[in-house]
Amino acid sequence: KDKIFDYFFVILIIFWFFSAIISLWMFFTQFGVKIPMDNRYYPLRMGFLGNRLFGVFPDPNFGATISVVVILLSVYYIKTNSNRAFTLFNSLNILLQLMFISLSGSRTALIVLLTVTAVGMFFVSYHSKKIDSQKLFLRWILSIISSLLTIAVLYLIIDALKTGLSYIPSLLQMKEASLPTIDTKNNLNKVNLDRPDVSNGGDISNLRFSLWSSAVEIFKSSWLVGASAANYIPYAHDVLPDSFIGQNTLTTHNFVFLIMASTGASGLLVFFIFFVNKIYISLKYLFGKSSLMQDMNFYVILSVLAITISALFITELVLVSTIGAVVIWFFLGKITSLENKDSLSK
């Protein structure tokens, strides 16, 4: 069974490795393209546009979130694989994914990265030999402090990468023009990475608050069974034309509100019971298992957490056909297998 996951891990890692390389090339060359499409609210965007790196992904939030998952899987192989070449590849891959995340301007991916790192570091510290011998309360405090310090350092690394990379396009242009690179004050320009859609006093939620409020309106109008996944937007146009979704062809950007609008209270209840069960299994495993850094299940659980957090801000996880949905439901199968007492006792 683990071989199937190994194959999946490696394929995902390799694919995202080359995706990151191509995306970074688009940033360094300042390539960007925008194609209007009749069936989309936003045009198809690729490359560097709007002061953020879309790269090969039409939506950088989705791409950068999977970059976090790929970082987790690369760490897993660094810890468990003795092949030096493969270790070097995964180390380089982690750097490339961090570079893409820093340039993507995805606040969702940054929240996901910091949260998953904090949770992962908490449990690693919790089971470490230095902390394991302490009293339970002190053990928790030291683990939390370790998590906070780790994400503080990680945030500084992301910020440093973002600042450093912003000068590379200018350096490449200077090299192509055969300009002297010594006079950096006059020739070296920094690429602006401040998103105009959320900076300068813009909507901090980027329309999410309006979308969530509109999803609640749909839920209230059909609270038991919802308006269906494929029909809640047309339903809003017909039944609630004054609502935000009724006036725009936009999705809910939150899996909870998507379930509410699409399946109503019945679907929300079923999913809530299912998800609480998976949370219980995961926490039981994480608190009961030591040597987590070499444990595949540890990284699977963190990957599920990563995509779940992202689904609080983008349309992901349920009732969609995305790479994130494929990853999380595949990994949830792995978590479900942990219910077996034999798996928990290993």
Predicted features by range, described:
Residues 3-7, 81-84, 133, 249-262, ...:
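Juxtamembrane loop-transmembrane helix junctions in multi-pass integral membrane proteins
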Residues 6-44, 48, 55-130, 134-142, ...:
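Alpha-helical transmembrane segments of multi-pass inner-membrane proteins
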Residues 21, 27-30, 121-199, 213-221, ...:
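A membrane-periplasm/extracellular boundary helix in multi-pass inner-membrane enzymes
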Residues 35-37, 165-168, 341-346:
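Short, Lys/Arg-enriched, Gly/Pro-containing loop segments at transmembrane-helix junctions
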Residues 41, 47, 196-263:
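Long extracytoplasmic/lumenal interhelical loops at the membrane interface
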Residues 54-67, 252-255, 260-264, 317-328:
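Membrane-interface micro-motifs in multi-pass membrane enzymes
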Residues 113-121, 297-346:
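Transmembrane alpha-helices of multi-pass inner-membrane enzymes
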Residues 288:
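Short, surface-exposed polybasic-aromatic patches that bind anionic ligands, especially phosphate groups
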